[in-house]
């Protein structure tokens, strides 16, 4: 069963053991996608996991017979040039038997899910650019796209109390126990936003977008930084035993083919007359 699809990947549920299969469909060639998946698996484990540790969920590299999922994968790729589809297994971080199908809140940066009794609450965030020396990249981009979002994850790094503004903006009557736990987590110096910010800042000191003049200027550090500026964080609260679990996904190896898009967006934002500073 197809669970979700994005620009480059699809998520499949093939059994009922709480595991999803993440298949790359960027290219029409199965062989090309399989090669990327193998490289990406090594990249996640050798490059990203050492930076974020236990926040990266465990993954397994598997090969699925093409015939088993041809009815699904065939809609995304061309004629099969491989007898298998390479995939990464990952824990289902939003099981429908807990959260159902309904999204309780949804904007460009945040989604909220919860069960009917609010025993389980899941906040999915895309913090994006947490470090940018010249201006707030997230808020400036919001202005450019006319997105009316009154909170900013980059601001939460310097003012953790701002997390309350985000929660209030959702309009959800969260349990007090959840609010205390959630706000307390983001007040700690090792919360996931602080970690991502510090890594982004360190990588920016090596090479920033302003340094990129051509493809020859693109380094592994730059591509890693672009990966970390596009992750998703799943923060799940369970009433009993009043615990938070944080998982970071979408940590795929970025391809240099995106360079023109990144540079053009950066130029457009830098030339904006409506820059935002925090």
From Swiss-Prot:
GO biological process: inositol phosphate biosynthetic process; nuclear-transcribed mRNA catabolic process, non-stop decay
Enzyme class: transferase
Source species, domain of life: Eukaryota
One GO cellular component, as annotated: nucleus
InterPro entries linked to this entry: Ins_P5_2-kin
Compartment annotation: Nucleus
EC numbers on record: 2.7.1.158
Chain location of the short sequence motif EXKPK motif per the record: 124-128
Catalytic activity as recorded in UniProt: 1D-myo-inositol 1,3,4,5,6-pentakisphosphate + ATP = 1D-myo-inositol hexakisphosphate + ADP + H(+)
Keyword set includes 4Fe-4S: no
Keyword Protein transport set for record: no
Sorted UniProt keywords: ATP-binding, Kinase, Nucleotide-binding, Nucleus, Transferase
PANTHER family given in the database record: INOSITOL POLYPHOSPHATE KINASE 1, INOSITOL-PENTAKISPHOSPHATE 2-KINASE
UniProt similarity note: Belongs to the IPK1 type 1 family.
Domain notes for this protein: The EXKPK motif is conserved in inositol-pentakisphosphate 2-kinases of both family 1 and 2.
Protein name as annotated: Inositol-pentakisphosphate 2-kinase
The organism's taxonomic lineage, starting at the top: Eukaryota, Fungi, Dikarya, Ascomycota, Saccharomycotina
């Amino acid at each position: 069963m197809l669970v979700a699809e994005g620009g480059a990947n699809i998520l499949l549920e093939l059994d009922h053991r709480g595991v999803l299969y993440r298949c790359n469909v960027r290219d029409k060639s199965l062989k090309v996608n399989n090669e990327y998946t193998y490289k990406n698996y090594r990249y996640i484990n050798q490059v990203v996991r050492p930076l974020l540790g236990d926040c990266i969920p465990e993954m397994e590299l598997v090969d699925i017979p093409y015939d088993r999922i041809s009815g699904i994968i065939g809609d995304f790729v061309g004629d099969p040039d491989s007898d298998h589809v390479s995939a990464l297994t990952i824990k289902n971080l939003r099981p429908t038997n807990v959260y159902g199908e309904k999204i309780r809140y949804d904007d460009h940066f945040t989604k909220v899910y919860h069960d009917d009794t609010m025993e389980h609450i899941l906040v999915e965030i895309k913090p994006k650019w947490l470090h940018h020396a010249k201006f707030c990249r997230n808020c400036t981009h919001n202005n450019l796209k006319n997105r009316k979002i009154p909170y900013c994850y980059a601001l939460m790094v310097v003012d953790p109390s701002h997390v309350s503004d985000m929660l209030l903006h959702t309009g959800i009557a969260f349990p007090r126990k959840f609010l205390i736990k959630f706000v307390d987590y983001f007040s700690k110096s090792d919360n996931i936003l602080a970690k991502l910010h510090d890594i982004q800042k360190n990588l920016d000191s090596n090479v920033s977008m302003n340094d990129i003049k051509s493809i020859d200027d693109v380094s592994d550090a730059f591509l890693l930084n672009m990966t970390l500026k596009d992750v998703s964080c799943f923060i799940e609260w369970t009433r009993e035993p009043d615990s938070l679990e944080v998982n970071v996904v979408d940590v795929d190896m970025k391809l240099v083919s995106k360079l023109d898009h990144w540079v053009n967006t950066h130029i457009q934002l830098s030339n904006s007359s409506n820059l935002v500073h925090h």
